[in-house]
């Protein structure tokens, strides 16, 4: 299972992320990996159905509301500049940067996108 996070702005001041769940594996074309690279295009139909286009393949998904939302936390460990009035270091703090309330599930196999196949080679 591959999980991908998409960022958007929320109404409460926190970013609201959407979790994308894909079945199977996604392999990078080169050995550099997928981090920081464009995976594909996410679109929505007029009915609100999510459509993911990856290369020459198309996937149809559905939006699922999570019963228990996830919080995205950033760990902040104290340093020399993080001291209280008495010079003692403050403890480790966690900052909530985003909430994940929905996920997009792509559970079907990708369908190839074929356009204009020539009859003569």
From Swiss-Prot:
Keywords: Cell cycle, DNA replication, DNA-binding, Nucleus. Its main location: nucleus. InterPro entries: Ctf8. GO terms for biological process: DNA replication; mitotic sister chromatid cohesion; positive regulation of DNA-directed DNA polymerase activity. It is found in: Nucleus. Component of the CTF18-RFC complex, which consists of CTF18, CTF8, DSCC1, RFC2, RFC3, RFC4 and RFC5. The CTF18-RFC complex does not interact with the Rad9/Rad1/Hus1 complex. The CTF18-RFC complex interacts with POLH. CTF18/CTF8/DSCC1 associate with PCNA. CTF8 exists as a dimer with DSCC1. This is Chromosome transmission fidelity protein 8 homolog. It comes from Rattus norvegicus (Rat).
